[in-house]
Amino acid sequence: SQSADSIVLKRIIGEGSEIYGEGHSSFIGAGVTIGNGSVVRDSIIMKGTQIGENVVIDKAIIAENCSIGDNVTLGVGEEKPNKFNEKIYSFGLVTIGEDSEVPSNVSVGKNTAISGKTTKEDYPEGILDSGEVIIKAGDSE
């Protein structure tokens, strides 16, 4: 469903999704919730993902069953030179693996990759700069 105050342009919305913020040129999977004051642009949000309030997501692919806290920014900010080659700038997508948590008040730059099953402990600085990666081994069950 879509609240009366939400703005959704050029989008595909899955069944059971609730959008209270804005969605622009994005795919929103089934059972996704996007909180008040949040903006999703040019992104793919897979089923079961919960997005908090006042979140900005730009050019991201977020896998199934993720949790994005309040006041998070994904793929927003200045383009920065690559840490290994200053002639290469980080304009790329943000990718987040399944069952991951991005806690409230975290900033994630452009061209970043976050593996599946991350938790708030994986963000001790509260920031992931453009071009950086978080890799976390899955459970060995």
Regions found by a protein language model. Name each.
Residues 1-141:
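Left-handed beta-helix
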